[in-house]
């Protein structure tokens, strides 16, 4: 009986395949001692296709790590597009920048180093983002969602990663700060009138998790939208 790992391997092999640039990015990330918490290949291609489906030309990524998903976004926005990626750790950002140069997409990516809470306000007044991907410290999910709406516009796509946490997101009594952050994010998406959202559970080699998908329906008066 095939396992979910077998299915993940089959889908990756069949729908994603092998890419020397992306493989090198992961190798460089691991060689630098970064944690193996990047999005899985099938999920990365999902984000890539979602970006293309949305026609996104400006993408905001909160949580760069080694730049693996950043490369996927940069390829999706194409020439003339722009990806702004925020990374709290300067060592991670250095690895990401090297990976982006190797991938030939560094000219369309701006990696900004600092805590999301500090960097996001500096983006106010810039052109609105078409898609926002949130994959950083889970405790700050609601802060990042608020900024996603403020820096977006009606129609901006928002993706919030790691929202199921092995099913623990359904536990209202959890004391795990990451799970609490995931819960607060889901509750905000379900109650904040600026968003229309849903969520999907995922099961792959990294285990049981999920992703929330939303669109901004009203950026609000504080928004930086066009």
Locations of regions flagged by a protein language model:
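A short alpha-helical cap/connector motif
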Residues: 1-133, 138-159, 163-226
């Amino acid at each position: 009986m095939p396992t979910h790992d077998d299915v993940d391997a089959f889908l990756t092999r069949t729908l994603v395949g092998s890419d020397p640039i992306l493989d090198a990015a992961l190798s460089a990330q691991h060689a630098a001692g970064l944690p193996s918490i990047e999005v899985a290949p099938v999920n990365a291609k999902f984000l890539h296709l979602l970006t293309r489906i949305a026609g996104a030309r400006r993408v905001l990524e909160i949580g760069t790590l080694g730049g693996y998903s950043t490369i996927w976004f940069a390829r999706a926005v194409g020439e003339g597009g722009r990806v702004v990626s925020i990374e709290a750790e300067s060592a991670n950002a250095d690895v990401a920048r090297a990976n982006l140069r190797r991938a030939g997409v560094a000219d369309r990516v701006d990696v900004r180093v600092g805590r999301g809470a500090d960097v996001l306000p500096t983006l106010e007044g810039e052109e609105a983002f078409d898609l926002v991907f949130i994959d950083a410290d889970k405790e700050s999910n609601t802060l990042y969602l608020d900024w996603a709406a403020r820096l977006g516009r009606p129609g901006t796509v928002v993706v919030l990663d790691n929202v199921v946490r092995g099913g623990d997101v359904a536990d209202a009594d959890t004391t795990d700060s990451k799970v609490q952050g995931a819960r607060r994010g889901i509750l905000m998406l379900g109650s904040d009138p600026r968003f229309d959202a849903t969520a999907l559970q995922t099961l792959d080699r990294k285990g049981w998790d999920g992703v929330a998908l939303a669109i901004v329906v009203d950026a609000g008066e504080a928004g930086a939208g066009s």
